[in-house]
């Protein structure tokens, strides 16, 4: 029998038989991991198994490559805290869906896990989460091998007046170097460089990360389209202007 115990974030839940569910969790040491929770539809467990929840997970299986089973205990819920905030709820749904879409099963991403927990906690608290979400998408691209290089201009090598990102290379481009290519470049708002986090700037940043999610990451994952939850979040955010 193989067994481990660790805290994790609940990414998704789906029915399995009449009384059980299959949960997908993201943990620090074991990555994105699936398992059966017996009795998961019960009055005791159903309220605990809400996407975004922080859980104490114990996983057991006879063999390493088996799906195995989870027993779960609540650490802290987050769904109730965002239910009354459509924007935060859509952001949480987007982050959970992107994690499911992108992360390799059973591969550890310890630093990115910590950043995910911090983002979800910020969403539940309702403070400072908008730039944190943009940072999270940038970190996701980096983890997947498509990180943006914003350290200096790809054309001139300078690190001043950076205003655009090359849609091909993901490298920054200065305003002066953009020239006739300016209409083909992606925006590089100040927030992506550690500047003020205005709504317009965050939306511009998400336009840029969205390009790489759709045109770089998705093709690498078998040309599956990015999750609709992200498009819904961008729509809700755009209407919040």
From Swiss-Prot:
One of its GO terms (cellular component) is bacterial nucleoid. Keywords: DNA damage, DNA recombination, DNA repair. It holds the Pfam family RecO_N. One of its GO terms (biological process) is DNA recombination. Belongs to the RecO family. Involved in DNA repair and RecF pathway recombination. NCBIfam families: reco. This is DNA repair protein RecO. It comes from Dinoroseobacter shibae (strain DSM 16493 / NCIMB 14021 / DFL 12). The gene is recO.
């Amino acid at each position: 029998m193989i067994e481990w115990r660790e805290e994790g974030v609940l990414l998704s839940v789906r029915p399995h038989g009449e009384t059980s569910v299959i949960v997908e969790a993201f943990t620090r040491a074991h990555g994105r991991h699936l398992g059966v929770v017996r009795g998961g539809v019960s009055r005791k467990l159903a309220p605990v198994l809400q996407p975004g929840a922080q859980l104490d997970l114990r996983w057991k299986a006879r063999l390493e490559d088996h799906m195995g089973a989870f027993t779960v205990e609540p650490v802290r819920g987050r769904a109730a805290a965002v239910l009354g905030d459509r924007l935060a709820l859509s952001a949480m749904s987007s982050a959970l869906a992107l994690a499911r879409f992108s992360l390799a099963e059973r591969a550890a991403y310890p630093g990115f896990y910590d950043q995910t927990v911090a983002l979800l906690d910020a969403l539940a608290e309702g403070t400072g989460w908008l730039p944190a979400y943009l940072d999270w998408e940038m970190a996701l691209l980096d983890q997947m091998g498509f990180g943006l290089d914003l350290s200096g201009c790809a054309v001139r090598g300078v690190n001043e007046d950076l205003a655009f990102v090359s849609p091909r290379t993901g490298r920054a481009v200065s305003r002066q170097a953009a020239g006739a290519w300016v209409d083909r470049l992606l925006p590089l708002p100040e927030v992506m460089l550690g500047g003020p986090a205005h709504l317009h700037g965050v939306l511009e940043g998400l336009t840029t990360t969205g390009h790489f999610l759709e045109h770089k990451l998705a093709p690498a994952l078998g040309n599956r389209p990015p999750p609709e939850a992200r498009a819904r979040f961008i729509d809700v955010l755009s209407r919040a202007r």
